[in-house]
């Protein structure tokens, strides 16, 4: 993902890994990729993976993703900390299909929701929960772009993969990054 920003026209020194930027609801947030140009934010990218125990982490990862985006937008709206270009954020998820049994995730005994659940979540696997989340992140503008990659190990030990969300593929992410970098280069001559 870092290389996508560089290939789009940013200098290598302008695209850093694992760096913090200011937050509003918290002091700062460390993003996996932070791209800048002339001291202004071009984009931030969060990269997550789920290799085991999805039941322990799926909801937390989705909640964290929403919070990170809301926090970044709030600090920009209220302080302008990131410069004149506004916030551009992407969320990427690699999910190991081998940990997902493809069985529907059931509610714990006596823990049914009090209100009707969105039909799209019925039935739900952890992989489908991530796919729904990232598709909605993009369509609702929570994130500008994303990438979901589902992986598995084939019987011959090679790695297989698919990109289950048409709006969140490597190619759509690259297209979004290229457009954002072009915008930054034009807006900040």
Which sequence ranges carry the predicted segments?
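A cross-taxonomic marker for long C-terminal extensions/tails that follow the last structured domain
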Residues: 150-189
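Glycine-rich, often proline-containing surface loops adjacent to acidic residues and nearby aromatics
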Residues: 40-51, 90
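Acidic, metal/cofactor-coordinating or nucleic-acid-engaging core segments within structured domains
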Residues: 55-155, 166
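Acidic-basic catalytic patches of nuclease active cores, encompassing PD-(D/E)XK
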Residues: 1-18
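A generic structural signal for well-ordered alpha-helical segments enriched in polar/charged residues
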Residues: 3, 7, 71-74, 183
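Charged, often glycine-rich, active-site loop that binds/positions anionic groups
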Residues: 18-33
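Active-site beta-strand-loop-beta-strand hairpin of nuclease catalytic cores
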Residues: 27, 34-44
């Amino acid at each position: 993902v870092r290389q996508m920003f560089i290939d789009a026209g940013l200098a290598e020194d302008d695209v850093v890994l694992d760096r913090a930027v200011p937050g509003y609801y918290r002091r700062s947030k460390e993003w996996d990729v932070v791209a800048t140009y002339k001291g202004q934010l071009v984009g931030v990218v969060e990269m997550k993976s789920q290799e085991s125990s999805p039941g322990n982490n799926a909801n937390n990862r989705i909640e964290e993703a929403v919070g990170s985006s809301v926090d970044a937008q709030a600090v920009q709206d209220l302080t302008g900390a990131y410069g004149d270009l506004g916030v551009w954020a992407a969320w990427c998820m690699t999910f190991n299909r081998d940990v997902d049994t493809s069985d529907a995730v059931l509610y714990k005994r006596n823990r049914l929701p009090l209100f009707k659940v969105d039909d799209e979540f019925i039935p739900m696997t952890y992989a489908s929960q991530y796919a729904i989340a990232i598709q909605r992140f993009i369509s609702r503008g929570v994130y500008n772009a994303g990438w979901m990659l589902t992986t598995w190990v084939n019987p011959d030990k090679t790695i297989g993969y698919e990109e289950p969300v048409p709006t969140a593929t490597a190619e759509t992410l690259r297209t979004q990054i290229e457009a954002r970098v072009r915008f930054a280069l034009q807006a900040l001559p």
